[in-house]
């Protein structure tokens, strides 16, 4: 099974060519939308390493990375993409769909940011890991009235809005994302993520 490994970032040296398959399988297990991921990771047979250097802007660097990954994954006939530093493992088809969105002018945040889930005190939570790569706080959202998928979709929309702008929000500020979705922002320190975050709640 071919895997494209995103092995290094600007201003760093490329790592050895081996992959920790056990660690990769653990990361693959945490993608609930890629059911075949863990099996593919465990059966890994070969890989290509992709790195981007010399691009100063984080958003622009990830734009370039996505374009290169799509080209390599297509020509290399890869089945999955592994970004260990970002806790991401997803399918080739998913990458190509995200690259198509990029061509249409959208930021493919799901190919750049990890979105995780957990439950606590009768509520579902969704959170990000990877916003720090862009100099932004991580995001959290919680609700006892919405499904995990609804939380996921809301957080994706806010992450896209956050990376597309240079805005900073005050505590309690309302962010209108579209006619159907408005979120209230609460900056805080998250004991779960152990970092400063923006905790989001639904307006209604």
Say what each PLM segment does:
Residues 84-204:
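Aromatic/basic-lined ligand-recognition segments
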Residues 11-112:
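Internal, hydrophobic cores of structured domains that mediate oligomerization or house catalytic pockets
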Residues 1-23, 39-42, 167-180, 186-188:
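Long, low-complexity, Ser/Thr/Gly/Pro-rich intrinsically disordered segments that act as flexible linkers
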């Amino acid at each position: 099974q071919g895997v494209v490994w995103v092995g290094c970032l600007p201003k760093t040296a490329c790592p050895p060519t081996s992959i920790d398959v056990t660690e990769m399988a653990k990361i693959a297990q945490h993608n609930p939308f890629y059911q075949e991921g863990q099996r593919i990771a465990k059966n890994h047979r070969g890989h290509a390493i992709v790195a981007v250097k010399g691009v100063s802007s984080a958003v622009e660097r990830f734009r370039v990375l996505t374009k290169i990954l799509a080209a390599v994954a297509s020509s290399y006939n890869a089945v999955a993409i592994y970004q260990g530093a970002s806790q991401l493992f997803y399918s080739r088809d998913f990458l190509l769909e995200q690259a198509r969105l990029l061509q249409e002018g959208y930021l493919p945040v799901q190919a750049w940011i990890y979105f995780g889930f957990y439950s606590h005190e009768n509520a579902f939570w969704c959170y990000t890991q990877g916003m720090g790569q862009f100099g932004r706080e991580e995001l959290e959202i919680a609700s006892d009235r919405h499904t995990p998928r609804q939380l996921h979709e809301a957080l994706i929309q806010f992450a896209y809005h956050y990376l597309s702008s240079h805005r900073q929000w005050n505590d309690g500020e309302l962010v209108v994302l579209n006619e159907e979705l408005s979120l209230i922002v609460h900056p805080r320190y998250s004991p779960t993520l152990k970092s400063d975050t923006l905790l989001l709640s639904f307006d209604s």
